[in-house]
Amino acid sequence: YDKRRHPKKLTPLAYKQFIPNVAEKTLGASGRYEGKITRNSERFKELTPNYNPDIIFKDEENTVMNQWPGVKLRVTEGWDEDGHHFEESLHYEGRAVDITTSDRDKSKYGTLSRLAVEAGF
């Protein structure tokens, strides 16, 4: 009797596929918009910085490295205050992140999306 957990087969997400299958701004995906966080707001203190020098952005489980040795997770946008997103963007609250891989290989994006879903994003 084998009690070991077998790794789940990761199916890449399709282009423009969402998990859950609803748009980013809907209640089912991200909850209510709570308002933009600025550097001077109290909520700014709740954001968690990441200073790990070995990765472009934190990947504690090394899922990207395990999937593609030598490749790092690359965050292109996280919390933001520049005003370049739509008015109620979750980037302004620190609840949205745009990711890619360090080698910028677009063929990896479907699997990268699935890894993000499996990690709870």
Swiss-Prot record:
Binding residue positions for Zn(2+): H91, D98
GO cellular component entries: extracellular space; plasma membrane
Chain positions recorded as Ca(2+) 2 binding sites: E61, E77, D80, D82
GO term, biological process aspect, one: regulation of gene expression
Pfam family, one: HH_signal
The keyword Mitochondrion is assigned to this record: no
GO MF term (any one): calcium ion binding
Principal subcellular localisation of the protein: secreted
Amino acids binding Ca(2+) 1: E60, E61, T76, E77
Keyword Glycoprotein attached: no
PTM field: The C-terminal domain displays an autoproteolysis activity and a cholesterol transferase activity. Both activities result in the cleavage of the full-length protein and covalent attachment of a cholesterol moiety to the C-terminal of the newly generated N-terminal fragment (N-product). The N-product is the active species in both local and long-range signaling, whereas the C-product has no signaling activity. Cholesterylation is required for N-product targeting to lipid rafts and multimerization.
UniProt feature coiled coil, ranges: none
Record keywords: Autocatalytic cleavage, Calcium, Cell membrane, Developmental protein, Hydrolase, Lipoprotein, Membrane, Metal-binding, Palmitate, Protease, Secreted, Zinc
Protein location: Secreted; Cell membrane
Stated family: Belongs to the hedgehog family.
Subunit and interaction comment: N-product is active as a multimer.
UniProt comment concerning the protein's domains: The sonic hedgehog protein N-product binds calcium and zinc ions; this stabilizes the protein fold and is essential for protein-protein interactions mediated by this domain.
Protein task: Intercellular signal essential for a variety of patterning events during development. Signal produced by the notochord that induces somite patterning, dorso-ventral patterning of the brain and early patterning of the developing eyes. Displays floor plate-inducing activity. Binds to the patched (PTC) receptor, which functions in association with smoothened (SMO), to activate the transcription of target genes. In the absence of SHH, PTC represses the constitutive signaling activity of SMO.
Protein name: Sonic hedgehog protein
Organism expressing this protein natively: Amblypharyngodon chulabhornae
